Amino acid sequence: XGKTFPDVXP
């Protein structure tokens, strides 16, 4: 998803 909390993931 992304690189920042809470979207940590691909």
Curated annotation (Swiss-Prot):
It is found in: Secreted, Cell wall, S-layer. GO terms for cellular component: extracellular region; S-layer. Its main location: secreted. Keywords: Cell wall, S-layer, Secreted. Coiled coil: none annotated. The S-layer is a paracrystalline mono-layered assembly of proteins which coat the surface of bacteria. This is S-layer protein.
